[in-house]
């Protein structure tokens, strides 16, 4: 059972980022899936989750600019980029929520670097 993010790359502010998380070995219909990011030198920052039911929930800062969707075997993140969004982006199985002490994540992707300049 694994998840893997698509390639990131170099973007400009106001670009729209689209990342795809491809899953293998399990069905998305049975799991919540989260997107998380980590800026250089910073801690993990939760972006949002798509629940097994298909409904979504976002961090307050991401609510107006991020969209998480899914297909049968992928989870997509779309985000309107700003200059502050350089980070490694991770897909994770489970719901990190706002507190990592209460995280239910059990599978992490390797991450993909997104540079905004």
From Swiss-Prot:
Q: Which cysteines are joined by disulfide bonds?
A: 21-91
Q: The organism sits in which domain of life? A: Eukaryota
Pfam families documented for this protein:
V-set
Task: Give all residue intervals belonging to the Ig-like domain.
Answer: 1-106
Q: Does the keyword NADP apply?
A: no
Q: Which InterPro entries match?
A: Ig-like_dom, Ig-like_dom_sf, Ig-like_fold, Ig_sub, Ig_V-set, IgHV
Q: Which residues carry this modification: Pyrrolidone carboxylic acid?
A: 1
Alphabetical UniProt keywords: Adaptive immunity, Disulfide bond, Immunity, Immunoglobulin, Pyrrolidone carboxylic acid
GO cellular component terms, alphabetically, are: extracellular region; immunoglobulin complex
A GO BP entry is: adaptive immune response
The further comment given in this record reads: This chain was obtained from antibody to type III pneumococci and was isolated from the serum of a single rabbit.
Recorded protein name is Ig heavy chain V-A2 region K-25
